[in-house]
UniProtKB/Swiss-Prot annotation:
Subunit structure: Acetyl-CoA carboxylase is a heterohexamer composed of biotin carboxyl carrier protein (AccB), biotin carboxylase (AccC) and two subunits each of ACCase subunit alpha (AccA) and ACCase subunit beta (AccD).
Keyword rRNA-binding included in the entry's annotation: no
Annotated EC: 2.1.3.15
Protein name: Acetyl-coenzyme A carboxylase carboxyl transferase subunit beta
Primary localization: cytoplasm
GO BP: any one term: fatty acid biosynthetic process
Keywords, comma-separated and alphabetical: ATP-binding, Cytoplasm, Fatty acid biosynthesis, Fatty acid metabolism, Lipid biosynthesis, Lipid metabolism, Metal-binding, Nucleotide-binding, Transferase, Zinc, Zinc-finger
Gene: accD
């Protein structure tokens, strides 16, 4: 037996550690490897570089509203392939794939509840659902959110994260821009606050309608906000755009948005602003996250 074989015979093979998938993730900005559970506790904000990663609609609403107060609205509304649209793939197949991937029926989730004990209606986009694109169901759910806010005489908050209108629904998608804007006019007539929170990215028909119609337009840090994307603009005007173009820090310098708020500070900031606008006592930052339990809304059959 050679000396190499003798060494080999004395080596005990080590057992390969098995790490479940999804335990670790990597920051999109700095590349830091992060523990998934810790990142979720930090509201999907990188603890090293403060990069705000994309957050699911449900996690966002649960992080905003008081525990035990959330009631979902418009969940019975489902998209339909009325036009029998097909590009490289059938629209109904794209819908089925997005629904399976996200667990959502469409790209907007609406809930009513309380924020530091104050009644609020909140909506949030699920960007993972076809890029948060706006179709008939998104428009109908947003209008439902406005109607609920009017009924409860309370504020409305919407977190936008969208690539714009859903091309598979053609003009029916574009119609939602006017539909949602008209609904918000009723909020203005009643004197009820509507706060729009712009997250990364907020583009196209969503930015050209209700996303920029807030009484206050708040953005998260480094969020991409605009109509056409930077690459499309550069190709059209044939000029190099300035650094940070269409990012929230660039837009606040130009007066296009009102403020930038970090995600961990968003809940208290929104509660403070809404309390002031509704002429209510300022929220206690140390108060536990327990709100008034709101009774479930009665089941209603609605058509988009």
């Amino acid at each position: 037996m050679s000396w190499i074989e003798r060494i080999k015979s004395n080596i005990t093979p080590t057992r390969k550690a098995s790490i479940p998938e999804g335990v670790w993730t990597k920051c999109d900005s700095c590349g830091q490897v992060l523990y998934r559970a810790e990142l979720e506790r930090n509201l999907e904000v990188c603890p090293k570089c403060d990069h705000h990663m994309r957050m699911s609609a449900r996690n966002r609403l649960h992080s905003l509203l008081d525990e035990g107060s959330l009631v979902e609205l418009g969940s019975e509304l489902e998209p339909k392939d009325v036009l029998k649209f097909r590009d490289s793939k059938k629209y109904k197949d794209r819908l089925a794939s997005a629904q399976k991937e996200t667990g959502e029926k469409d790209a907007l989730v609406v809930m009513k509840g309380t924020l530091h004990g104050m009644p609020v209606v909140a909506a949030a986009f699920e960007f993972a659902f076809m890029g948060g694109s706006m179709g008939s169901v998104v428009g109908a759910r947003f209008v439902r959110a406005v109607e609920q806010a009017l009924e409860d005489n309370c504020p409305l908050v919407c977190f936008s994260a969208s690539g714009g209108a859903r091309m598979q629904e053609a003009l029916m998608s574009l119609m939602q821009m006017a539909k949602t804007s008209a609904a918000l006019a009723k909020m203005q007539e009643r004197g009820l606050p509507y706060i729009s929170v712009l997250t990364d990215p907020t583009m196209g028909g969503v930015s050209a309608s209700f996303a920029m119609l807030g009484d206050l337009n708040i953005a998260e840090p480094k969020a991409l906000i605009g109509f056409a994307g930077p690459r499309v603009i550069e190709q059209t005007v044939r000029e190099k755009l300035p650094p940070g173009f269409q990012r929230s820090e660039f837009l606040i310098e130009k007066g296009a948005i009102d403020m930038i708020v970090r995600r961990p500070e968003m809940r208290l900031k929104l509660a403070s602003i809404l309390a002031k606008l509704m002429n209510l006592p300022a929220p206690n930052p140390d108060a536990p996250r327990e709100g008034v339990v709101v009774p479930p809304a009665p089941d209603q059959e609605s058509e988009v």
